Amino acid sequence: MDEIDNIILHSLRQIECNLDEEVISLDDLSPSMLVQVVSKCISLIDPGLELPRTLPPGMAQRFTATASLAEACRTIGYRRDIGYQTFLYSNVAEVRRVLMFLVEKLPKEAADKTSGSGQPVDSATQLENRILSSLQSQLQAPWMPEFCQVGRPEGLSTTSGGESPAQIAFRRFIPRKISVPFVTQGDVAAEVKEFWSRRNLDCLDEGSLVPSLIAANDGAIKTNAKGAIDEVDRQVKLPAINEKLLQYYSKGGTKHRLAEPSGAAASSGTTEKVVLNNITVETKPGKTPLESLQEEIDALQQEIVQHSEEGVQLESSRKETDESIEEYRKTIVRLKEEKKIKERTHILLEDPEVNVKKLEAIIAAGGERMKKLQDQWDAHRIPLVDTLEAYRLKNSDKLSKSQQVLDQIESTRQKCEEVVIDLQTKGAMYARLQKEFEKLNKTVSRTAYTSRILEIIGNIRKQKNGIDQILQDTRSLQKEINNITGQLDRQFTVTDDLIFRNAKKDEHSKRAYKLLVTLHSDCEELIKLVQETGAIKREVRDLEDQIENEKGRNTAANLAQITHDLTEMQNESQRLEESIRRMEVTSRQ
């Protein structure tokens, strides 16, 4: 038990229960410490329960708090007897059962903490934990198409969040800030403008060039500086920019032209052309190339939305088609089964007389075969049944002998218990005499000691002889009972056989046979009553032993504590009544 207590206390300390170093066993747990420990464990098992963390000072509050703890223990599955007395007037065995139950019910995190806390984690374990967490996060993330993941900024969530497919596809439109401090000023030299334009445009990659230009032009329009980027486009004639734009439009995957040339506009000369080497963008009067690009982007967005809706409709129609195909398959299978049945029926109906005779012959052959199988089964079953009956008879004889042996063992056990009780009595007497001997004067003569020892030895020898005589008488009595029982059984068997033979011819013999059977049943009932009486006596002895064990507990100390608590409660009640009276008097005044 000390080892179990150490394990329980170690587990409680690992879950951060405030236990003093002086607490080395469960006997050292006071009611307040026990309440704190149980409350901590229950809060870890079920955090939703509201429980008192400490034991209140008042007796009424103590009873309420401990009763709530007992109810919480029953709520989480404790099936033994528990109440406020378990915490206020605790018994070590009950406390051990409660704490063992709570430690076993602790959640996995707390159990891991109790088993592995304080151990350093090596780098390999840390790496495995990081890999595990990364894989778990990737597995929990929803799947996204590949084209929706291109150009996604770092840290952007992979969930769609209810966005349309067009919005997901156009996430790659990521503009960057273009810093052109004084390119648009009139007094700046062309070489300086070219230098700053080249430097700023070379800082951009092919994916963010066009979005950056569009965003910068839009900002210039908002700040009443319309045409700032257009002037740069007109003045800067760089092969690098042309190559980047060509690569962008060739890799962008779009097959649409930026703007279709209009014949009427070309003939009338109402269109304006902005040329960057090999790239030509025709714009309508009053519109910039950025606006034309924006219109093209809007058109592409509408097409993407339209294609997405068409894809959803096609998917729904595909599902409906799959369902109809499955129904058709089931119908085909059912029709094939019906076709087989009808074909067989048609074959039978082609020549009914011959087919009926064939069926009758098959049925007759099956009946004969069944009869042969039944005969074979009976031929195998009857010997096995006889063998089984013989084994049952042998088993019943063995059971009767086993019962006799069990009765002998039980009687021997009772005698051993009596001897043990007698030995305990003698041990108590020996302890008492030992204490008396220690209290005696050391100057007692050797003769008194010798006579006392001889007297004790004589008494012990007499008691031993008496016990041996009782055991011998019991053994002889048991042997006589067994012999008489065997003789009675044999005599009853012989008498039953003789009277049964004459009972068929003589009426008196028949009556004597009935009386013999009644006598035998009465004797068996009497034996059963004697056995039940012995069992009741054994139960009485067990109950007496339990009473002695209960007397050995600290019942007196618990009663004294209960009396003390009752006195405190009465004093508290009196103080409360006095305070209520004072408050009433104050309110009346």
From Swiss-Prot:
Pfam families: CCDC22_CC (PF05667), CCDC22_N (PF21674). One of its GO terms (molecular function) is cullin family protein binding. It comes from Aedes aegypti. This is Coiled-coil domain-containing protein 22 homolog. InterPro entries: CCDC22, CCDC22_CC, CCDC22_N. PANTHER family: COILED-COIL DOMAIN-CONTAINING PROTEIN 22 (PTHR15668:SF4), JM1 PROTEIN (PTHR15668). Belongs to the CCDC22 family. One of its GO terms (biological process) is positive regulation of ubiquitin-dependent protein catabolic process. The keyword Magnesium does not apply. The keyword Coiled coil applies. Residues 568-589 are annotated as: Disordered. Residues 287-426, 523-589 form a coiled coil. Residues 574-589 have a biased composition (Basic and acidic residues). Keywords: Coiled coil. The lineage of its organism: Eukaryota, Metazoa, Ecdysozoa, Arthropoda, Hexapoda.
